[in-house]
């Protein structure tokens, strides 16, 4: 704030409610170059997937749509650095993934550095070059998202990406994601099924293993009370 090379998109958006989406996006673009202003506005409307809303008043938009307009307005003058605070927090899931891909691809194309403050690991996992994890106002991890996902230092870090089991296996304490556990009839690690949750492409199974609760993914449902063997993938 206060520096032309840096833009910040807060969660309150600070938009002009009684003007159009296009006018909001082009607010800080020069009126002396109307054709360039119009072209830039159209380009950003495509990035946020709101071309059909160009003439709509901002006050008629949903919270998620207003959030997208605020991001586009911040990008209008192509800052060197942009800070996004929970940028997809109010956007529906069906739109979120598409918008994430388009926005972060655009930022890389324009060589705009971006800092994202988020509680959603998906914002970082596929798009960030580096990820900093803060807990109780202290930095507890700083590395690439890939390294933090594959070798989390503690449960808090792993839980940012997915459900995670903190288990003692053969006397060793391990952090294990549900997809890293498979059912194996030959395994000596026995567990008893307690619950199951349909997740679309798989079932999330809850079981007890050595007096510990464990969650794992399975292609099919498993009946309550069944004893199974578990194989833990390294």
Which residues fall in each region the model found?
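Conserved ABC ATPase signature
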Residues: 57-61, 65
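Non-catalytic connector elements of ABC transporters
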Residues: 173-234
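Conserved ABC ATPase "signature" region
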Residues: 36-53, 105
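A short, proline-enriched helix->beta-strand linker immediately N-terminal to the Walker B motif
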Residues: 76-80
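ABC-type ATPase nucleotide-binding domains, specifically the catalytic core motifs of the NBD
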Residues: 14-38, 47
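Conserved ABC ATPase "signature" C-loop
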Residues: 136-137
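Catalytic Walker B motif of ABC-type/P-loop ATPase nucleotide-binding domains
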Residues: 82-86
